């Protein structure tokens, strides 16, 4: 081992794009970043498709990105894994046990999930396959649609609703019950007023009522409300849940289903309806004691575990929006804290959308980081700056430019702090976003992640090095080489430090 310590700085949503048009990063005022890329070794990292365990051309996301960064290997992601396993869904023992209980209770099945082909939180085909299986098993099904508009174009819901309606039109035991924008049904930032609106529509049939789903979406469009923000509403004569019913969540990503599922499964008050017979696609969290259709596989010997096994101290810092990513996901889906691992969560601003406060909590994260650096205690510090991603998702390029300038100032403060210390600053991202802000083909803001590579930069290294291009799973092995810690065989990534010369 050496005396080096490493700060892994994850600029969430910061991609490389040679085209400066509609590129918030290229257009922002970034003197410190310009200095960094002019004087420190750098390379490009791939964040999508098979390089991160996803299908070809499937864009990456924060969950996949942090799993890849922390595990140091290509992990077959839930999307790909479930794509294979769902082919035998009618024989899935977990589904059969779930439906047997519904039959015994003479109940119906509620299916909820993000109706999207974005591939980040869900797959439309998964929902359709499960609907078919339940119909085959002669279970009455009602569907609660969560609309996207974030990992898909902002006004694209009618496309997916038409696909769903066409699929179920000949299924007499299947109907659409509610519609909600993901802003309400998939909040992860403890804004429970949003989650409650979605819950009330599902549990009690509360909300504006429409005869059919197309008119519900069109009515919101006419009011200037796009997919993500569509207010929870009710379709047809849907009256709500009964305690004898069952509930399936078809999202395969955990962070944005926990709040709504806790409301559905846990007693809140005397007027609250809960469904004990609830099942998810994967094990979402230890907080949720519900079974799953496709159990996860354990990931061992992650970067965090290796640092802990070396009896070294490590620190994770992020604001609320990305806290799970630098902890749970970075540790390979492990919620328990490793020995000598510390975690600090900085509250995200309480605003409707982050273009209203593009600085988010970046300055607070930086101030906290600098205090911790000065302790000279930690061998590894992992921080996540959410700005480029979360502000980029709003599609507001001017606000995103302000977010990028904020990050630039934070990087300048970090570099000044680590000067003449043993800290080496490793800068990268989990995926792109802010570097591509407009969809020219569809003539609308582009709010999703991108297929662009992300930067990989090593700052303050004591000797001159060159870096190779690679993938996200190569970051952990590179950090281990810097720390002079042996890479375990489970890590199949390679160090990006070029030793060919």
Swiss-Prot record:
InterPro entries, per database record: Alkaline_phosphatase_core_sf, BPG-indep_PGM_N, Metalloenzyme, PGAM_B_sf, Pgm_bpd_ind
Enzyme Commission number(s) from the entry: 5.4.2.12
Reported cofactor(s): Mn(2+)
Positions that bind substrate: 121, 150-151, 182, 188, 253-256, 322
Binding site for Mn(2+) 1: 389, 393, 449
Pfam families listed in its UniProt record: iPGM_N (PF06415), Metalloenzyme (PF01676)
Keyword Manganese tagged: yes
Catalysis performed (reactions): (2R)-2-phosphoglycerate = (2R)-3-phosphoglycerate
One annotated Gene Ontology cellular component of this protein: cytosol
Pathway: Carbohydrate degradation; glycolysis; pyruvate from D-glyceraldehyde 3-phosphate: step 3/5
Residues binding Mn(2+) 2, per UniProt: 12, 62, 430-431
UniProt keywords, alphabetically: Glycolysis, Isomerase, Manganese, Metal-binding
Superkingdom in the source lineage: Bacteria
GO BP: any one term: glucose catabolic process
Details of cofactor binding: Binds 2 manganese ions per subunit.
A GO MF label: phosphoglycerate mutase activity
Active site positions: 62
Family annotation (NCBIfam families): pgm_bpd_ind
PANTHER family in the cross-refs: 2,3-BISPHOSPHOGLYCERATE-INDEPENDENT PHOSPHOGLYCERATE MUTASE
Cited function: Catalyzes the interconversion of 2-phosphoglycerate and 3-phosphoglycerate.
Assembly and interaction partners: Monomer.
Sequence similarity: Belongs to the BPG-independent phosphoglycerate mutase family.
Name used for this protein in its record: 2,3-bisphosphoglycerate-independent phosphoglycerate mutase
Organism, scientific name: Ehrlichia ruminantium (strain Gardel)
Gene designation per UniProt: gpmI
């Amino acid at each position: 081992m050496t005396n080096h310590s490493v700060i892994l700085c994850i600029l969430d949503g910061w991609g490389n794009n040679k085209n400066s048009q509609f590129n918030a990063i290229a257009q922002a005022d970034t003197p410190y970043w310009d200095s960094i890329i002019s004087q420190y070794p750098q390379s490009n990292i791939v964040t999508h498709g098979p390089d991160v365990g996803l299908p070809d051309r499937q864009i990456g996301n924060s969950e996949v990105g942090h799993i890849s960064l922390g595990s140091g290997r290509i992990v077959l992601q839930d999307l790909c894994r479930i794509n294979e396993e769902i082919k035998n869904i009618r024989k899935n023992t977990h589904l059969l046990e779930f439906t047997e209980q519904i039959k015994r209770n003479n109940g119906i099945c509620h299916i909820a999930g993000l109706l999207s082909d974005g591939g980040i939180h869900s797959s439309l085909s998964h929902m359709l396959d499960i609907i078919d299986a339940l119909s085959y098993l002669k279970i009455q099904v009602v569907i609660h649609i969560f609309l996207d508009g974030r990992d898909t174009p902002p006004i694209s819901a009618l496309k997916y609703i038409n696909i769903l309606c066409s699929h179920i039109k000949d299924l007499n035991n299947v109907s659409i019950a509610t519609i909600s924008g993901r802003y309400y049904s998939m909040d992860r930032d403890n804004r429970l007023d949003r989650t409650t609106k979605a819950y009330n529509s599902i549990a009690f049939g509360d909300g504006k009522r429409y005869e059919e789903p197309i008119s519900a979406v069109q009515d919101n469009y006419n009011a200037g409300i796009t997919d993500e923000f569509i207010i929870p509403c009710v379709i047809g004569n849907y009256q709500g849940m009964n305690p004898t019913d069952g509930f399936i969540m078809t999202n395969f990503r955990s962070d944005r289903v926990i709040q709504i599922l806790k409301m559905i499964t846990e007693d809140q008050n005397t007027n609250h309806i809960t469904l004990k017979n609830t099942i998810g696609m994967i094990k979402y969290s230890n907080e949720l004691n519900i079974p799953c259709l496709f159990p996860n596989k354990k990931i061992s010997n992650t970067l965090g575990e290796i640092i802990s096994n070396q009896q070294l101290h490590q620190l994770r810092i992020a604001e609320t929006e990305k806290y799970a990513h630098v902890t749970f996901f970075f540790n390979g889906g492990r919620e328990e804290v490793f020995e000598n691992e510390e975690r600090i969560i900085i509250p995200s601003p309480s605003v409707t959308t982050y273009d209203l406060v593009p600085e988010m909590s970046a300055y607070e994260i930086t101030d906290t980081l600098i205090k911790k650096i000065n302790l000279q205690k930690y061998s590894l510090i992992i921080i996540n700056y959410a700005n480029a991603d979360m502000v980029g998702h709003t599609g507001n390029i001017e606000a995103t430019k302000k977010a990028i300038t904020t990050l630039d100032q934070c990087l300048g403060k970090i570099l000044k702090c680590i000067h003449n210390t043993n800290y080496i600053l490793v800068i990268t991202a989990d995926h792109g976003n802010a570097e591509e802000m407009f969809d020219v083909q569809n003539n609308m803001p582009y709010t999703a992640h991108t297929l662009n590579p992300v930067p990989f930069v090593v700052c303050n290294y004591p000797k001159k090095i060159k870096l190779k291009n690679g993938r996200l799973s190569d970051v952990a092995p590179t950090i281990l080489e810097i720390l002079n810690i042996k890479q375990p065989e489970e890590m199949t990534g390679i160090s990006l430090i070029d030793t060919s010369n």
